[in-house]
Every structure is written in structure tokens, then in C-alpha cells.
């Protein structure tokens, strides 16, 4: 008998129906002659909080963590199922955090039979049967679980010790998570740069008008106005100079399908939904089989889904199918079927937001064309760039061409004051996520999207709810309480330390080190962090 474990009741029912397990043996357990599908909620096994183990000790860096079962009746129902199983399959759309929960379940029930994984990216009958047929097994799943276990251990170590540190130095407990600390540090740095920004231009550029009014900007910037004026005096006003016209074509700036991050950003900007609300609504739509899994950072679709997309949009000129980082198990968020029943209004709004993004992607121009005219006078280079649209897009070929421009006039201007970084909520959400993911992307750790360590939108949302960050319209700032916390972090590179150790945990997936070495290294770094904030720690 094959035992399949799911983590929510709607997914359990859908998987059971898809695989013919039509007999309900107990609440949340469905069987057939060959397959049993059981719902085991994430809260089934509880990690014992360190505050219950520390007995007041601070700092507290235990070698081992404890866990306990919270649902005894379900445990009694599951024991005979695990004993009878010839294979245990985990069916989920989650990443390392979900795989770690499955690992703990198997350890609790002392599973000795083979284990495998179904990736439930889409809760449709065909997709579920395909995932079951092509279920994965192998050492990489154990390594994925180790990444999740180590990440959870670091969460617990950080949460307990940073709370105790704050209490020891006279601040309240904020139940700060690692992700919230990283986000708070980013907002604090950003707020500091805004406070120090004086808007004074720090150089001069030359602007040239040619051929009836088009403006060209010098590529170089001169610190002294006299130097810029000397260059401007050499510009032959009224004469024609040779120039190069370059037309480039790129799809780099095209609209992409939604990821969880862009969906949270889009929903905030267009619907006013906070990130946690967007995630909850998207999870509900996924559970109902209306959209694919929202737990993704991939903005592309695999070739295998071309047929599905073309049942909705027969022509897809705006999307270039082909090689990308999407697979049938990990891809962008898309709608799977039409709404066939009454939905809560906010779920309906989010569904149509996803659908309209899909429509925009497939109906856009397949690429964008940009024209750049560049000419040189002495050592000074002047350029102008614009996007080609409409008929110009259709008739203009790519390449480089020689042309000429007649200079009408030239003048020296103070440089525009440098544009400060944006503190718009969605821009901050995007920036802190990009910062957190940068090393993993560069080093290709390839860890599937993991909600507990990757959702910085929800971390910022939590900071707002805790009163550490203020949301003023669409902009975010540190609150006075947040400033007190940030003052303990400022200039000490704590966020970089936390991100470094998360990368080390993610690197476990590649099998390059052990979980114990990562936890020990993180504990040492965390102890240094605690002692930096509170020199009296441990006394």
C-alpha cells in the first residue's frame, strides 16, 4: 500500500479523488485497494520553543531541539497506516520547510520504507496523476529536508536570543524573526540615507540640442563647471557631425508572469492588499484548483504548458517559449480554469489580477526595440536613447548605421540631483527580496521556493503590524520603536551575517557540508551578535 501525505484538507480530497481513493476511512483519510491519502496539518508536530527549554538561561544555544505531537487522536489513526505502508509519498507545493516537516513525521513514525515526493504545483486531476507517476526519490530530498531543518533551527535560536537580548537592554520583546531583522535593517539604512540626502548636485553635464530640438546628454560628468565649459566651447555649433544610430532588440524589459513577490506587489498597488492577505487569498485560490501554486520565484512557463495557455489565448505572440528556468514542477503563477462557483469578492479580484497579467504577457510585443544615437566631439561622448513603438517598431531593422546630426546649441547645466532610492512599499519589498536572493542566484543553490525563508513581503507586513515600520500612504519609514531596534543593528552588518548563514543552509541542498556545522557556525555568529548588543550577556 502507498501512503500519501498532504498538508491541508482540500489538497487531500483532490489528490484522493484524482488517484481513486474514494473511501473515507476517517476524517481526512481516504483509501482504495492500493493508495491511502491522509491529511497531516503542519501543526501536527510542534517544535518546542526554546523559552520552554532554556529555564532562564541566556544566551542559550542548545545542541539539540525537541518536538512533540499536538494531535494525539490523529497520531493513533496514522500509526497503522505507516506500519502498513510499502512507500510513503509527500504531496506538497512547499520547499525546504515543508520537506523538513515530512522528515520529522517520518522520523516520529520510524518509517523504514522508501519515501518519495509529489510536487503539487497544480491541483488538477491530470497534474496530480502526472506528479504521482513521476514522483521523485533520492538523496536530494534528504538534503532539502536538512536545509529546512537547519533554517528552522536558526529561526528558533535567533528568536529566543534576540528577544532576551532586547529585554536585557531595556527594549520590549518583538518576537523578531530573522527575515524581519533583515527587512528592518534595510528600511533603517534606507531611512538613514534619506535623512542624509541634501539634494545638492555634485557635478555638471553638457546638453546639446540638434536637428530641430532633440536633446543629447553628455556621457561624462565634470566636477568643476570650468572644465565642462571648456569642453562646451569646443562644440561646433551650426555644423553637422557624424553620428552612429544603433537599434537594439531585447525582451529583458518585457512583462513576465507573476511570482509570489510580483503578485504581492501588484495586489498592493492595484487592490490595496497587504502581502500576508495576498498570500492567504492566493493559497485559497490554489486549494480550490483555480490557480497554480503561489509558492514560486519563477516568472516563466515550461513548453509543456503551452497547450494549456493556448486553450485560453489561442495566439501567444508576446511570450517566447523555449529554454528558461521553468519546469512542470516549478513555474510562474497562472490561472488553471474559469471560475465556476461563487467566490469571495477579494479572491475574485486576485484571480482576475492574475488572469489579466497573463493576458498582458501573451499579447505584448515579443520584444522591445531601442534606438540610440551617439556622437563624439573630442573625448566627450553625447547620446540620446528612445523606445521604438507603433509603425517605427515594425519597419525599423536592428543594427548600427551611420548618420549625421546638426548641432543647434550647447550649454552646461548642473547635474540633476541624484535620485534617492525609493521607499515605496513595493519597491522596498522588491529590493530586500533581491538582496536576500542575490547570493543564492549567483551560486545556484537551486533550493525550491521556501516560504519561511523567502517571503520578505510578509516580513515587511509583520513589521508594520508590530509597529516597527510605519506605512505612510505607499511609503515606509522606521517608527520610533523601530528606530530603537535599528540603532542596535546599525553599522554592524548583522543582516549580512544572517543572510550568509541562510546561504550556508541553502548550500546543504548541494551536499557540500553538514547541517551540524552550519548550526554551530550560526550559533557562534549569533553569540557574537548578542554580546555586541549586550556586553553583559551571560554574566
Spans of model-derived segments:
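Active-site-adjacent bridging/hinge elements
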Residues: 77, 158, 163, 236-241, ...
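Leucine-rich, amphipathic alpha-helical/linker segments
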Residues: 318-332, 336, 494-538
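Catalytic phosphate-handling regions of large nucleic-acid enzymes and associated NTPases
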Residues: 194-201, 286-309, 324-337, 365, ...
Amino acid at each position: 500500500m502507498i501512503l500519501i501525505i498532504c498538508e491541508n484538507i482540500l489538497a487531500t480530497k483532490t489528490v484522493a479523488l484524482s488517484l481513486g481513493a474514494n473511501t473515507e476511512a476517517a476524517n481526512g483519510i481516504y483509501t482504495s485497494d492500493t493508495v491511502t491519502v491522509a491529511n497531516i496539518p503542519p501543526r501536527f508536530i510542534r517544535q518546542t520553543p526554546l523559552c520552554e527549554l532554556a529555564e532562564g538561561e541566556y544566551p542559550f544555544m542548545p545542541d539539540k531541539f525537541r518536538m512533540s505531537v499536538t494531535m494525539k487522536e490523529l497520531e493513533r489513526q496514522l500509526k497503522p497506516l505507516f506500519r502498513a505502508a510499502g512507500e510513503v509519498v509527500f504531496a506538497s507545493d512547499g520547499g525546504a520547510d515543508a520537506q523538513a516537516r515530512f522528515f520529522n513525521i517520518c522520523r516520529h513514525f520510524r518509517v523504514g520504507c522508501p519515501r518519495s515526493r509529489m510536487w503539487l504545483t497544480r491541483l488538477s486531476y491530470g497534474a496530480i496523476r502526472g506528479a504521482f507517476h513521476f514522483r521523485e526519490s533520492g538523496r536530494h530530498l534528504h538534503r532539502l529536508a536538512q536545509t529546512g531543518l537547519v533554517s528552522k533551527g536558526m529561526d528558533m535560536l535567533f528568536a529566543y536570543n534576540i528577544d532576551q537580548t532586547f529585554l536585557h537592554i531595556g527594549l520590549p520583546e518583538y518576537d523578531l524573526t530573522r527575515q524581519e531583522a533583515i527587512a528592518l535593517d534595510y528600511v533603517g539604512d534606507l531611512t538613514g540615507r534619506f535623512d542624509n540626502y541634501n539634494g545638492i548636485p555634485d557635478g555638471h553635464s553638457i546638453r546639446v540640442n540638434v536637428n530641430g530640438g532633440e536633446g543629447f546628454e553628455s556621457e561624462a560628468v565634470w566636477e568643476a563647471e570650468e572644465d565642462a565649459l571648456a569642453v562646451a566651447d569646443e562644440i561646433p555649433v551650426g555644423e553637422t557631425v557624424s553620428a552612429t544610430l544603433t537599434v537594439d532588440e531585447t525582451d529583458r524589459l518585457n512583462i513576465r508572469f507573476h511570482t509570489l513577490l510580483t503578485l504581492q506587489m501588484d495586489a498592493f498597488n492595484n487592490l490595496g492588499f497587504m502581502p500576508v492577505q495576498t498570500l492567504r487569498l492566493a493559497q485559497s485560490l490554489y486549494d480550490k484548483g483555480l490557480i497554480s501554486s503561489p509558492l514560486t520565484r519563477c516568472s516563466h512557463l515550461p513548453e509543456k504548458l503551452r497547450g494549456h495557455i493556448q486553450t485560453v489565448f489561442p495566439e501567444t505572440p508576446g511570450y517566447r517559449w523555449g529554454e528558461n528556468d521553468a519546469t512542470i514542477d516549478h513555474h510562474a503563477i497562472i490561472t488553471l480554469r474559469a471560475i465556476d462557483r461563487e467566490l469571495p469578492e477579494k479572491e475574485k479580484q486576485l484571480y482576475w489580477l492574475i488572469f489579466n497579467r497573463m493576458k498582458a504577457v501573451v499579447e505584448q510585443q515579443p520584444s522591445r526595440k531601442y534606438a540610440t544615437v551617439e556622437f563624439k566631439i573630442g573625448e566627450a561622448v553625447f547620446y540620446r536613447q528612445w523606445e521604438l513603438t507603433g509603425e517605427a517598431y515594425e519597419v525599423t531593422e536592428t543594427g548600427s548605421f551611420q548618420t549625421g546630426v546638426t548641432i543647434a546649441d550647447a550649454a552646461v547645466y548642473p547635474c540633476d540631483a541624484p535620485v534617492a532610492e525609493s521607499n515605496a512599499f513595493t519597491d522596498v519589498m522588491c529590493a530586500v527580496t533581491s538582496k536576500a536572493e542575490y547570493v543564492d542566484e549567483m551560486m545556484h543553490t537551486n533550493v525550491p521556493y521556501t516560504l519561511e525563508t523567502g517571503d520578505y513581503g510578509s516580513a515587511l507586513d509583520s513589521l508594520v503590524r508590530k509597529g516597527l515600520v510605519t506605512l505612510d500612504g505607499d511609503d515606509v519609514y522606521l517608527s520610533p520603536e523601530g528606530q530603537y531596534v535599528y540603532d542596535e543593528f546599525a553599522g554592524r552588518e548583522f543582516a549580512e551575517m544572517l543572510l550568509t548563514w541562510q546561504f550556508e543552509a541553502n548550500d546543504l541542498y548541494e551536499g557540500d557540508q553538514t547541517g551540524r556545522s552550519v548550526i554551530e557556525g550560526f550559533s557562534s555568529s549569533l553569540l557574537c551578535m548578542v554580546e555586541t548588543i549586550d556586553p553583559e550577556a551571560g554574566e
